[in-house]
Swiss-Prot record:
Pfam families: HGTP_anticodon, tRNA-synt_His. One of its GO terms (molecular function) is transferase activity. Belongs to the class-II aminoacyl-tRNA synthetase family. It comes from Streptococcus pneumoniae serotype 4 (strain ATCC BAA-334 / TIGR4). InterPro entries: aa-tRNA-synth_II, aa-tRNA-synth_II/BPL/LPL, Anticodon-bd, Anticodon-bd_dom_sf, His-tRNA-ligase, HisRS-like_core, HisRS/HisZ, HisRS_anticodon. It catalyses: tRNA(His) + L-histidine + ATP = L-histidyl-tRNA(His) + AMP + diphosphate + H(+). Its EC number is 6.1.1.21. This is Histidine--tRNA ligase. GO terms for cellular component: cytoplasm. PROSITE patterns: AA_TRNA_LIGASE_II (PS50862). It is an enzyme of class 6 (ligase). Keywords: Aminoacyl-tRNA synthetase, ATP-binding, Cytoplasm, Ligase, Nucleotide-binding, Protein biosynthesis. Homodimer. It is found in: Cytoplasm.
């Protein structure tokens, strides 16, 4: 019997979960400024929702999916990414209806699952924050969404981020480029890695972003997608580039970037930063104008991105970025004697109901041990409550940093601790 966590998963303990809550709250605040609303979808979906939209030949579907048959013999998969479930929800709930304002903007947060080799910043259960925007084919939507990602990364403190940009064009441009790539790579097939030999038959564009050395050599002189764009595709990409420049967002054209999912068209992008000599993608996404119709909805443009929370936190740690997390207690009550037990319970509850973060001793320890706990909790103020204080109704409240003290009534603490808190040099929000 295994009583440990499964391989590729982690327990997020309190010291770490505070960072997660900060990142999630920070993302919510940024997304709200751009008029995005949260959507929550199931963590498991029908297998076809993922396989048909992400692509039957992608690594996600062929190698990495957690899928199974449930007791009703339904083929189920744990979601490996966030876009397909959100699109499925958009169509199933008829959010394309005329009365729903367009563009429709959604964000999501939650666990995703892929069976892959666990490594730094990459787990089998990982967490993603993402956004999806439906109903606008305007290149300004591409740019606004990319700018929102840049805004988030800059404000949270990620350093040295570079925006890599490419286009896959419309279906006609992509088909022409696909054939040109097949014609170029077929004579080189024997020099490719085994995976890329398979990709050449199924999805040749995926050979371009292979990390294998032999594949990188093979594609060095490959044709560029930019040479196969028709007028519509070229105009869209030119507009995206111009608007990014208007907003002062620097970018690098990366024609070997294709993204790992089949549903993209036109603009695709990645934000990349270097950590210990390795390029790490922190956020990526693009346009997917055919996906809503693929799920049975009307022809609807889409654009979005996703970022991995574990990867983001790893980069912040490696770059020495300290998140401004407030963990300190406002009040710690040291309790002395059985006669003070009930009053301490009443007092700590009254403080919490006034909005203060408060804790008390429950273990009947010596005062020295209780004072140490107050220090460990970084308590701003300290109240020592014994039987004599209960009898007199008066107690000392101490600033646990400066040691300044004030003598006050228990009734005042129960009803208006803010006044005491401010008198000792702290401010209430």
């Amino acid at each position: 019997m295994k009583l440990q966590k499964p391989k590729g998963t982690q327990d997020i303990l309190p010291a770490e979960s505070a960072k997660w809550q900060y990142v999630e709250g920070f993302a919510r605040e940024i997304f709200k400024r751009y008029n995005y609303a949260e959507v929550r979808t199931p963590i498991f979906e029908h297998y076809e929702v993922i396989s048909r939209s992400v692509g039957d030949t992608t690594d996600i579907v062929t190698k990495e999916m957690y899928d199974f048959y449930d007791k009703g013999d339904r083929h189920i998969t744990l979601r490996p990414e966030g876009t397909a479930p959100v699109v499925r929800s958009y169509v199933e709930n008829k959010l394309f209806a005329p009365e729903v304002q367009k563009p429709s903007k959604f964000y999501y947060m939650g666990p995703m699952f892929r069976y892959e080799r666990p490594q730094a910043g990459r787990l089998r259960q990982f967490h993603q924050i993402g956004v999806e925007c439906f109903g606008s084919s305007n290149p300004a939507t591409d740019v606004e969404t990319i700018a929102m990602a840049a805004h988030f990364l800059k404000e949270i403190g990620i350093q040295g981020v570079k925006l890599h940009l490419n286009t896959l064009g419309n279906p006609e441009s992509r088909a022409a480029y696909r054939q040109a790539l097949i014609d170029y790579l077929t004579p080189l097939k024997e020099t490719l890695s085994k995976d890329s030999q398979r990709r050449l038959e199924e999805n040749p564009l995926r050979v371009l972003d292979s990390k294998e050395k032999e594949d990188k050599v093979a594609v060095e002189n490959a044709p560029s997608i930019l040479d196969f764009l028709d007028e519509e595709s070229q105009a869209h990409f030119d507009a995206v580039r111009q608007m990014l420049e208007n907003l002062g967002v620097d970018y690098i054209i990366d024609t070997n970037m294709v993204r790992g999912l089949d549903y993209y068209n036109h603009t695709i992008f990645e934000f990349i930063t270097e950590i210990e000599g390795n390029d790490l993608t922190v956020c990526a996404g693009g346009r997917y104008d055919g996906l809503v119709a693929y799920f049975g909805g009307p022809e609807t443009a889409g654009f979005g991105f996703g970022l991995g929370v574990e990867r983001l936190l790893l980069i912040l740690e490696k770059q020495g970025v300290t998140l401004p997390i407030e963990n300190a207690l406002d009040v710690y009550i040291a309790v002395l004697g059985e006669g003070a037990n009930i009053k301490a319970l009443e007092l700590v509850q009254a403080l919490r109901q006034q909005g203060f973060k408060a804790e008390r001793d429950y273990l009947n320890r010596k005062l020295k041990a209780q004072f140490k706990s107050a220090d460990v909790f970084a308590a701003k103020t300290l109240i020592t409550l014994g039987e004599s204080e209960v009898e007199s109704g008066q107690v000392t409240v101490k600033n646990n940093q400066t040691r300044e003290e004030v003598q006050v009534s228990l009734e005042t603490i129960s009803q208006n601790f803010s006044e005491i808190f401010e008198k000792l040099g702290f401010y209430t929000q």
